[in-house]
């Protein structure tokens, strides 16, 4: 390949790259005049001072529960799972109005033993009054490496039909 031909190849590749970036950037443009419907609610909490609910998260977005060790984060998360699985109001506080086409809940725990994860799920079942919820899939990932956990979480998210709610208890 001659010097000029090599130079032309590089310029062509740069031009392609610039064109692809331009197209991608344009596809991300937010049009202020476009009518965009609000996202569907994934979960919300009842306001103590009224009958109104405060949005905690919408479909397609991430929410994070953060707190000190032993501050009952897992308890709160299990209430959220109960709300998502049952579609009911949990402890007169939390609800998750998931539609039937987004009603599957996947729960990963990365810290607890299989025994303790099962106990947590049994508490959820007791709370919602259902023996075995058909829309809850639970996985204990403690024994796996972080890279294995990530692969399995991604796989489950990509391959669970009608997925509406994902919980990962114990991300570091």
Model-derived regions: residue spans:
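Interdomain "pre-motor" coupling segment immediately N-terminal to P-loop NTPase/helicase cores
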Residues: 1-16
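The Walker A/P-loop phosphate-binding site
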Residues: 13-124, 131
């Amino acid at each position: 390949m001659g010097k000029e031909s090599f130079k032309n190849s590089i310029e062509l590749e740069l031009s392609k790259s610039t064109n692809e970036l331009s197209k991608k950037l344009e596809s991300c443009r937010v049009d202020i005049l476009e009518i965009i419907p609000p996202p569907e609610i994934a979960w919300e909490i009842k306001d103590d001072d009224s009958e109104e609910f405060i949005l905690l998260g919408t479909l397609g977005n991430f929410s994070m529960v953060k707190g000190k060790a032993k501050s009952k984060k897992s308890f709160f998360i299990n209430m959220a799972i109960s709300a998502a699985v049952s579609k009911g109001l949990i402890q007169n506080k939390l609800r998750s109005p998931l539609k039937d086409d987004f009603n599957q809940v996947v729960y990963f725990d990365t810290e607890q033993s299989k025994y303790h994860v099962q106990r947590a799920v049994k508490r959820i079942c007791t709370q919602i009054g259902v023996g075995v919820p058909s829309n809850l899939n639970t996985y204990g990932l403690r024994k796996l490496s972080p890279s294995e956990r990530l692969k399995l979480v991604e796989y489950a998210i990509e391959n669970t039909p009608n997925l509406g709610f994902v919980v990962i208890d114990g991300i570091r």
